[in-house]
Amino acid sequence: MHPSLFSFFNRGVASIFALSFGIAAAPNGFCSDVFRGNETFQSFNKAKKILEHQVIFDHRVTLYCNAPFDKDKWISLPPGFTTQVHKKRANRVEWEHVLPAENFGRFFPEWREGSPMCTDNRGAPFKGRKCAEKSNITFRLMQSDMYNLFPVIGAVNAERGNKNFGLLSA
């Protein structure tokens, strides 16, 4: 391991240890509510509406490009922004899961294997996100967690897909 990377790693471990110790030493109940996650909203659409109308109503900018948008969700694209593939989504605000739904969804059996609840109107079984939404309350709560949702340019959301965050070389 490169010496500077080793030093960075050691500082990171020390910081995590200090944070963990600080949390453990915090007054009883102090952090329990902070780390619980969403226990209220099961509707992804309702969560998006609450964020739009009650949280970011006075600061409407997209996450990655800092592009402003109005109450009608019209985006002022930043200078130089172009897309060849997702043109219909370029001027549209969408809500991005910072941790992609697939990354937590694939741990649910309904996502991987389906559920008896998941059949279409012809009786054909289905699985994946649609099945997890329909049949698993924990998935719905996670999908609707407002700490994981941010407004983005639709074309950027489409391009990112379910990829994790990472560092890009300049």
Language-model features: where?
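Bacterial N-terminal signal peptides that target proteins for export
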Residues: 2-16
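The N-terminal extracellular segments of secreted preproproteins, especially immediately downstream
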Residues: 29-30, 64, 117, 130
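Aromatic-lined ligand-binding clefts that engage carbohydrates, nucleic acids, or primary amines
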Residues: 30-91
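Domain-level detector of nuclease and nuclease-like folds
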Residues: 81-170
